[in-house]
Amino acid sequence: MPSAKSSDLSPTKTNLESTTKQKVSVQDIFLYIPNLIGYLRIITAIISFLCMANHPVATLIFYGISGFLDAFDGYAARKFNQGTRFGAVLDMVTDRCATSSLIVYLGVLYPQYTVFWQILVSLDLSSHYMHMYAMLSAGSTSHKNVDETQSKLLSLYYNNRLVLFFVCLINELFYMAVYLHYYKFFWLGTVMLVASTPIWLFKQIANIIQLKNASLILARMDAHDHSKRD
């Protein structure tokens, strides 16, 4: 009786890989390490909101923790290969909600500048939403994949993780400094406000540019689609 070939008796490498790979469930995605960090960011941000009216130091601590953790969710996603669409959106939504909530409270403390705060919230939300929507609609896997042909400033802002982290951090420090200034914290308030203003201005310019670029991307796609119809 002829002997069976060894290739017939042993599973192939592909079969071994397929049997060892585990199916990732929806619950697994929610429990990925970067997403757990995202939930912790949300919790600490909410605690800071609860402290804003009467406990400025506690607000600074918890809001600071929420912002500082922003540096670690992306790192964890890369280190453990746990980058997800849900995590990317959770990260951006948390950033936008935290910043907007702080600015809203600044409107309570400084009602004479209400229109100014409204414009800042509108610019922040609209520019980031339109940028993300435009990039994903254009086929990009991430809203952070910006090349120099679109904008050198945005390319530097999104592709250099150090620049992105520090610009976002100092932008948040500006709003926190305005908050602390109301409570007469001179060194933490007024001095930090003056020091952070240039980077805050840079961030607003970046928001305007990404709003403009996103509008152009969407308009070009619309023009292409309508040209094909005609």
UniProtKB/Swiss-Prot annotation:
Topology term for the membrane: Multi-pass membrane protein
Keywords tagged on the record: Endoplasmic reticulum, Lipid biosynthesis, Lipid metabolism, Magnesium, Manganese, Membrane, Metal-binding, Phospholipid biosynthesis, Phospholipid metabolism, Transferase, Transmembrane, Transmembrane helix
Required cofactor names: Mn(2+); Mg(2+)
Cofactor note: Catalytic activity is higher with Mg(2+).
Residue sites binding Mg(2+) 2 per the record: 70, 91, 95
UniProt family annotation: Belongs to the CDP-alcohol phosphatidyltransferase class-I family.
Name this polypeptide is given: CDP-diacylglycerol--inositol 3-phosphatidyltransferase
Species of the source: Candida albicans (strain SC5314 / ATCC MYA-2876) (Yeast)
Upper classification of the organism: Eukaryota, Fungi, Dikarya, Ascomycota, Saccharomycotina
Gene name tied to this protein: PIS1
